[in-house]
């Protein structure tokens, strides 16, 4: 089975709302902690200032952040000025039983400068498509003041309870130890709901490891599509993803926080780098490698049920809807470039597996 992994949740829902959290300015105030904590919070604030603007400035800044890919006009902003940089993420040409086709790409929701300009195979797929299909379009939400205000409210407990009352002592202790590697004290997070704590830690990890959600593949393509006037199709929605994240049970977050036991900042960064390396080479199976008995040591039967529930909600239930959306688009003969998180394509119950079971053929695109 697959236990709960922080890096897995990072690149499905949580990473997609990193920009939302940053634009809220709601990384916890660590003024009560040591200087390292202050430095971590300052880093987040600085990054927010660099990447969060308003109106037209927001779109231009996002594209310009990717080297050699700034938008100069409304024509095709994903240029042919590509380079051989060893980036070959998994991409497929999918054909329906009726003969309609679609190009599907596995994305990574936060990337580094080295990934840009994009490989020619990706730029061609984008430029040749009439529609860009993505998990959700967060570009307008980041500029919606009312939405952001409501999001901030949902990050905090409003019933006079605190974090320590919603998770076990074991989870609290593991989280406290892990926060120490960031120079933070758990007392700074007591007023935050588990989803906000989890997403804040993801944000800090992304930034400390020199990744940038503004340079994430789907965010880059979204920004470009808006500049080009290309039609955007949301497979899910911002509300759907936020509600999923917010409504996970305390039991799921308790197990998630307990998984920090024995982890350090460096070990989490290495896990992130390992997934990034796998993504760059098109190795999607690494995203869903099964855990061995040693790695599952300490998991009770109840823990395994909780992990299964999490993985079903986070991946497999969504995969079914994503595959259906792809089938619907192909049945209409739409010319679509379909881009969702790489983990959604992997293994049994992944998008490719589901499509093949429905009679579709999937051929890996060679770079």
Describe the residue ranges of each PLM region:
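N-terminal low-complexity, Pro/Thr/Ser-rich intrinsically disordered segments
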Residues: 52-94
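Sec-dependent N-terminal signal peptides of Gram-positive bacterial secreted proteins and lipoproteins
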Residues: 3-28
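Structured, acidic catalytic/metal-binding patches in enzyme active sites
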Residues: 79-80, 90-310, 314
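Extracellular/periplasmic catalytic domains that process cell-envelope and extracellular macromolecules
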Residues: 85, 96-97, 330-332
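Phosphate-group recognition and catalysis centered on beta-loop-alpha active-site segments
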Residues: 31-32, 38, 63-67, 71-76, ...
């Amino acid at each position: 089975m697959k236990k709960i992994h922080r890096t897995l949740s990072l690149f499905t829902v949580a990473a997609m709302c990193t920009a939302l959290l940053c634009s809220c300015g709601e990384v916890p105030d660590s003024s009560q902690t040591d200087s390292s904590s202050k430095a971590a919070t300052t880093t987040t604030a600085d990054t927010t200032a660099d990447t969060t603007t308003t109106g037209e400035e927001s779109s231009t800044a996002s594209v310009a952040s990717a080297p050699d890919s700034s938008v100069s006009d409304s024509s095709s902003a994903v240029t042919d000025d590509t380079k051989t940089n060893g980036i070959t993420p998994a991409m497929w040409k999918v054909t329906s039983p009726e003969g309609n086709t679609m190009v599907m790409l596995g994305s990574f929701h936060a990337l580094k400068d080295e990934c840009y300009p994009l490989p020619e195979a990706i730029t061609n797929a984008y430029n040749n498509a009439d529609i860009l299909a993505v998990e959700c379009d967060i570009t307008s939400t980041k500029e919606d003041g009312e939405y952001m205000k409501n999001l901030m409210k949902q990050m905090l407990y409003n019933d006079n309870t605190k974090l320590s009352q919603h998770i076990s002592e074991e989870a609290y202790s593991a989280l406290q130890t892990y926060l120490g590697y960031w120079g933070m004290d758990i007392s700074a997070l007591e007023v935050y709901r588990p989803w906000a704590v989890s997403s804040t830690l993801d944000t800090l990890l992304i930034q400390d490891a020199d990744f940038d959600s503004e340079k994430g593949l789907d965010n880059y393509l979204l920004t470009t599509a808006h500049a080009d006037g290309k039609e955007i199709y949301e497979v899910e929605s911002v509300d759907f993803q936020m509600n999923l994240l917010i409504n996970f049970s305390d039991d799921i977050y308790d197990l998630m926080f307990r998984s920090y036991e024995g982890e350090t900042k460096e070990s989490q960064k290495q896990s992130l780098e390992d997934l990034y390396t796998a993504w760059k080479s098109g190795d999607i199976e690494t995203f869903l490698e099964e855990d061995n008995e040693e790695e599952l040591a300490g998991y009770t039967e109840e823990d395994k049920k909780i992990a299964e529930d999490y993985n079903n909600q986070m991946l497999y239930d969504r995969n079914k809807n994503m595959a259906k959306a792809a089938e619907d688009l192909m049945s209409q003969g739409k010319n679509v470039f379909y881009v969702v998180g790489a983990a959604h394509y992997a293994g049994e119950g992944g998008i490719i597996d589901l499509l093949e079971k429905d009679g579709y053929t999937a051929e890996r695109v060679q770079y």
